[in-house]
């Protein structure tokens, strides 16, 4: 066809040139033969019309030639691409068959691999929309996959599920990603959330692999199990809505939580919690055990409440706030903080005022309020001073609180340890209460006054309780009273930090009387010199050892008594 058109074009061009060359002859002929001017004009017009027709025919032929050449180039390009696609597809099929025959290692099961290999062809339209997946493929391979997807047909139906908008997960299968000619073939494709089951080529060969790796669920299998846990019609609707909401929120669900070796039923968890009034109500009422039973989880799971609360906050609580509005994030944080403080108060209350004859060598302290250690006098007159360490948000409170209250007694070693443990427990509880009061936002001046009063009251109460506890455990006769004619000054507490306590203790017939004066804390938390007034009266000769007590809170005093007369505490 091309040859015929070229020959016709050449003949037309020759005819046009010959007619053009004969034009001067025709023009000059009228003068030579003596014809009239009118006849010469008509011939000239006829020649011009003939030339115009020939030129139009020549242009039309040239246009046809150009179109024919374009069609020929396109046809040859398409034929070459089809041949390349067919060759690459044969290599691809050979690689897949070789992978199945050899048994692909590191794959969860045979069925997901086959589904991925088939969906690599069916879902190529989605792959063209993703620039990251196209990065490793050239134009010819993309054309090949597009052509194959047209031949297969119906490939997009698998992606019409509720989770088609989620980003794909890339899985690499070693040994199945290269053809026999080392042509890179990409097998990492996203599988639909719950695709229709397909029959494997050799189920008997793939069954052992599926059984050996039964517990290693893939991302798609987890979603499929979540949708197929029961036949509730609202389950699919809820899960579709939940995943769409999380995707729009910018926090897509990329994995399903596993609890007790099974997929956590998000639908049932949400339904149980919202029926109880929402997450905040469940936390405040502490009914996580009912939620655990409703989910058919074993009750022996450790920290099940914490795990369920964490997973609910991550996957379901934003959806609850959006759809139901049962609580706000501020209320949730307040409920969590309240639950945490309650747990600490219970642990403190269990050890408060408990006396143990053995005691513990270490002293308890508040976990969140760490204050400096005090200097303790030793029997040989030396001092053991520990480096102060303060860790508190409010710096002005550092000079008003202490970390430990030591009451070393010369009766026995375990007596002093028990006294110290009980006093430390008392102070830990007091410091926890003070911390909660301080967090309520009171002025700094009022905080200091409240702490001074609280410390003085706690220390006197701790002394009395500890001595009574020893009296119940040991065969001693102890009397504790306030001997002072002025009853109003027996316990003098004031808000300016100045106070005094008159104490009288009788142990095994020996009476120890003293006045505890308040003093202001030193700058470096070192004990300052203080005089202590005391009286000593004995009924008969007694060689019982003296009782020396050293109490050093922030607004308390130090006192020591012995059988030799007045003494000054270091």
From Swiss-Prot:
Segments for region (Homodimerization): 475-495
Annotated PROSITE patterns: ARID, REKLES
Listed GO MF terms: DNA binding
Any GO BP: regulation of transcription by RNA polymerase II
Disordered: region residues: 102-215, 528-570
UniProt subunit comment: Homodimer.
UniProt protein name: AT-rich interactive domain-containing protein 3A
Organism: Danio rerio
């Amino acid at each position: 066809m091309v040859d015929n058109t070229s020959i016709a074009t050449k003949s037309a061009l020759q005819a046009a040139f010959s007619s053009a060359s004969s034009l001067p002859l025709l023009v000059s002929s009228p003068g030579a033969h003596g014809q009239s001017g009118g006849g010469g004009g008509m011939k000239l017009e006829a020649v011009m019309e003939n030339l115009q027709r020939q030129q139009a025919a020549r242009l039309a032929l040239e246009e046809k030639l150009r179109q024919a050449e374009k069609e020929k180039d396109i046809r040859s390009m398409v034929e070459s691409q089809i041949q390349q696609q067919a060759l690459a597809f044969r290599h691809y099929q050979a690689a897949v068959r070789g992978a199945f025959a050899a048994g692909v290692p590191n794959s969860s099961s045979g069925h997901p691999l086959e589904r991925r290999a088939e969906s690599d062809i069916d879902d190529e339209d989605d792959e063209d929309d993703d620039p990251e997946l196209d990065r490793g493929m050239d134009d010819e391979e993309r054309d090949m996959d597009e052509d194959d997807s047209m031949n297969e047909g119906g490939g997009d139906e698998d992606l019409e599920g509720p989770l088609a908008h989620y980003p794909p997960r890339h899985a690499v299968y070693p040994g199945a990603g290269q053809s026999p000619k080392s042509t890179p073939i990409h097998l990492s494709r996203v599988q639909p959330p719950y695709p229709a089951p397909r029959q494997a080529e050799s189920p008997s060969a793939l069954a052992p692999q599926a059984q050996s790796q039964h517990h290693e669920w893939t991302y798609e299998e987890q979603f499929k199990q979540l949708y197929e846990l029961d036949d509730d019609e609202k389950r699919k609707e809820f899960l579709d809505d939940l995943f769409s909401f999380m995707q729009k929120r910018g926090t897509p669900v990329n994995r399903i939580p596993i609890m007790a070796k099974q997929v956590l039923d998000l639908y049932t968890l949400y339904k149980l919690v919202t029926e109880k009034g929402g997450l905040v109500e469940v936390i405040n009422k502490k009914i996580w055990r009912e939620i655990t039973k409703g989910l058919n989880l074993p009750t022996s799971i450790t920290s099940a409440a914490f795990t369920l609360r964490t997973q609910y906050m991550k996957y379901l609580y934003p959806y609850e706030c959006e759809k139901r509005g049962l609580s706000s994030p501020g209320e949730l944080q307040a409920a969590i903080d309240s639950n945490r403080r309650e747990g600490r108060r219970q642990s403190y209350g269990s050890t408060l005022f408990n006396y143990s004859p053995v005691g513990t060598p270490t002293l308890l302290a508040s976990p969140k309020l760490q204050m400096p250690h005090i200097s303790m006098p030793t029997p040989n007159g030396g001092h053991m001073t520990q480096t102060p360490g303060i860790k508190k948000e409010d710096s002005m409170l550092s000079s008003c609180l202490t970390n430990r209250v030591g009451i070393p007694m010369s009766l026995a070693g375990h007596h002093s340890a028990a006294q110290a443990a009980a006093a430390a427990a008392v102070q830990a509880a007091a410091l926890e209460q003070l911390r909660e009061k301080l967090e309520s936002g009171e002025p700094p001046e009022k905080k200091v006054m409240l702490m001074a009063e609280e410390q003085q009251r706690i220390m006197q109460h701790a002394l009395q309780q500890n001595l009574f506890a020893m009296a119940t455990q040991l065969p001693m006769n102890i009397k504790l009273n306030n001997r002072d004619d002025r009853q109003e000054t027996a316990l003098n507490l004031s808000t300016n930090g100045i106070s005094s306590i008159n104490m009288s203790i009788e142990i095994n017939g020996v009476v120890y009387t003293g006045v505890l004066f308040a003093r202001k804390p030193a700058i470096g938390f070192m004990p300052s010199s203080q005089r202590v007034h005391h009286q000593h009266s004995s009924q008969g000769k007694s060689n019982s050892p003296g009782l020396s007590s050293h109490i050093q809170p922030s607004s308390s005093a130090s006192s020591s008594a012995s059988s030799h007369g007045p003494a000054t505490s270091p």
